[in-house]
A protein has these predicted regions:
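A generic local structural motif
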Residues: 13-18, 37-38, 62-63, 120-121, ...
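Short secondary-structure transition/capping segments
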Residues: 43-44, 63-64, 116-120, 136-137, ...
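Class I S-adenosyl-L-methionine
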Residues: 1-109, 114
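Class I SAM-dependent methyltransferase SAM-binding "motif I" and its flanking Rossmann-like core
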Residues: 84-155, 199-202
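Structural recognition of alpha->loop->beta junctions
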Residues: 26-27, 95-102, 126, 208-217
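Short secondary-structure boundary/capping segments
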Residues: 20, 42, 67, 124-125, ...
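A contiguous loop/helix-start segment that scaffolds small-molecule binding in enzyme catalytic cores
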Residues: 2, 60, 71-75, 131, ...
Length: 253
């Protein structure tokens, strides 16, 4: 059995209880060493075999899973954040399907949630934004033409940009090219959300590249953009005294 487990954004206590239990029971752990907090490996039993997938190819990862399965053991494939976002799990699951090896998925707290917590922010504010776009800048891995950053930026929605801080100048240019964001639109860069070395840089779209460079951030950071970082919004209807819900009547009813 293979368990795909989300490690959370960084802090060891942000892994789910199920994820922690699976780590404690695993015969083998293959973890994304470039991003997963190694403190989580302290949950492993002494005889557990541990592999750092940052040093491995897909084929090598699969070979380890097959060997453990053949021996009757269980493997935890430990991914950063939530595996469903930029986790490259589909190719692993397809290979396991082909081999007849059972697997399941345990979700984790994504780093985009960790970034919101670091900012003490809400991505979806009434009258400001009810949409969150999660994307990345094109680099060595291409993105579909219809998903170019400038095209997505045209919506002016809350945007969370993964895997792109090393291309910060291109990110800034694309955000402005979309037409909905202005140089004054609030933005932030969150480095290693929830880790002890977490750093939050608040800026605007116009100062995004310069602020990122000034703070020496070149990797392991999320870029967030949108008016949700500003001060304007309207009160939620859900808790308005005049609003009727299934559970209470509004004051004017």
């Amino acid at each position: 059995m293979v368990h795909f487990v989300g490690a959370g954004p960084g802090a060891p206590d942000l892994i789910t209880r199920r994820g922690a239990a699976l780590l404690q029971e695993a015969d083998c752990i293959i973890y994304a060493g470039s991003l997963v907090n190694p403190a989580l490996l302290g949950l492993a039993k002494p005889e557990c075999a541990v592999y750092n997938s940052a040093e491995m190819t897909l084929e090598q990862v699969l070979d380890v899973m097959r060997r453990v399965e053949a021996a009757g053991g269980t493997t935890v494939r430990l991914h950063t954040g939530d595996p469903c976002l930029y986790g490259a799990i589909r190719e692993q699951m397809d290979a396991l399907d082909a081999d007849g090896i059972p697997y399941d998925d345990t979700p984790g707290v994504s780093s985009f949630c960790g970034a919101a917590a670091a900012l003490n922010a809400e991505y979806t504010l009434p009258t400001i934004s009810q949409t969150v776009i999660i994307t990345r800048m094109e680099g060595r891995t291409p993105v579909p033409e219809k998903e170019k950053l400038a095209s997505l930026a045209a919506h002016g929605a809350t945007m969370v940009i993964f895997l792109s801080v090393g291309l910060i100048d291109k990110v800034q240019q694309a955000l402005l090219a979309g037409g909905a964001y202005t140089p004054e639109t609030p933005a932030a860069v969150v480095y290693k959300a929830s880790w002890p070395e977490q750093k939050v840089v608040r800026c605007t779209v116009g100062t995004l590249a310069g602020s990122t460079r000034t703070n020496g951030i070149t990797k392991t950071a999320l870029i967030v953009v949108g008016e949700f970082l500003g001060t304007r919004y309207e009160r939620s209807k859900l808790y308005d005294p005049t609003f009727t819900t299934e559970f209470r009547k509004g004051a004017d009813q």
